């Protein structure tokens, strides 16, 4: 089963992924972008080089293609639980070029079975961002991140409608352990 955690920076994805790694010891825990060695190089170029937005989008698509081919598909073949910090959903939400068709090509139509969306309101986001050093995206402000969050929701629900991916939306401001319990129950509930 392929499970992805989605949410804007500061929503608590990394915290939950860490807890899930401890809970599901045999799971493959990965991330996007940068879930492969090549992906780390592509991510570095995409985030640090002065390149066009279109070139940046294609670097992230290349990273996604390599990640699916070398990490996700082999783990699915072995029937492993896969837990990924981000996926094509973030790729489409953060990019100016959010083509589902190109992402389906990059993923070879390998899509998550379950999508966990950690959603946060403006005040909660401001509070969390005030406690950390901000990266390039976070420095664009809470309004930009809230716009991205809406795109995350839109893309996740589009995958649900078109491909049957299950979606769980959670209030990221709830306690870490309440969220963890709900996420574990969602993962363990195999219909």
Curated annotation (Swiss-Prot):
SUPFAM superfamilies: P-loop containing nucleoside triphosphate hydrolases. One of its GO terms (cellular component) is cytosol. ATP binds at residues 7-14. NCBIfam families: DTMP_kinase. This is Thymidylate kinase. The keyword Transferase applies. It comes from the Bacteria. GO terms for biological process: dTDP biosynthetic process; dTTP biosynthetic process; dUDP biosynthetic process. The keyword Kinase applies. Phosphorylation of dTMP to form dTDP in both de novo and salvage pathways of dTTP synthesis. Gene3D superfamilies: P-loop containing nucleotide triphosphate hydrolases (3.40.50.300). Belongs to the thymidylate kinase family. The lineage of its organism: Bacteria, Pseudomonadati, Campylobacterota, Epsilonproteobacteria, Campylobacterales. It catalyses: dTMP + ATP = dTDP + ADP. Pfam families: Thymidylate_kin.
